[in-house]
Amino acid sequence: MPNDTQIIELRRFLAERLPQARLGIAPRRTAPDTLATGIEAVDQALGGGLPKGGFTELVAPGEGSGSAQFLHALLRHTAAAGRFLTLVDGADSLDVDALEPEALAHLLWIRCRSTAEALQTTDLLLRDRNIALVVLDLKLNPAHELRRIQGTLWYR
């Protein structure tokens, strides 16, 4: 068991090396590179935007929940910044008529026929690391296919 002198020396050493710990302040962590969505409230909630090269799950409760509007706003913002958005469309359901031609020019649209195909495609794209923003849309995929997705698949 350490004596009082050793404890005092340890505290002094830690205070010199980690002054923020003494003040009850957590060390500042470096934030991952983020890509702004163009929606101020969302960017603030996410600490600057979506993590670049990462995976973020957005869940929409159903029809009319705003997921298409979110995707359109994200695409417009990405295009305005001169970047590309990669959309893995799990049910080949994107309404391209609703998008502006300028935004479409910055969209890599991968049309899939099944949930499994969409997941494999997304996995390959995320491993590549050359694509800054990948969106996987499974909203219209059949529920029985979605229930077969293993929970561990989402961890990176």
Which residues are covered by each model-predicted region?
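Short, solvent-exposed loop/turn segments at secondary-structure boundaries
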Residues: 145-149
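Conserved inter-motif catalytic segment of the P-loop NTP-binding fold
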Residues: 61, 81-144
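Short alpha-helix boundary/capping motifs
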Residues: 68, 115-116, 151
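Substrate-engagement module of ASCE P-loop NTPases
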Residues: 153-156
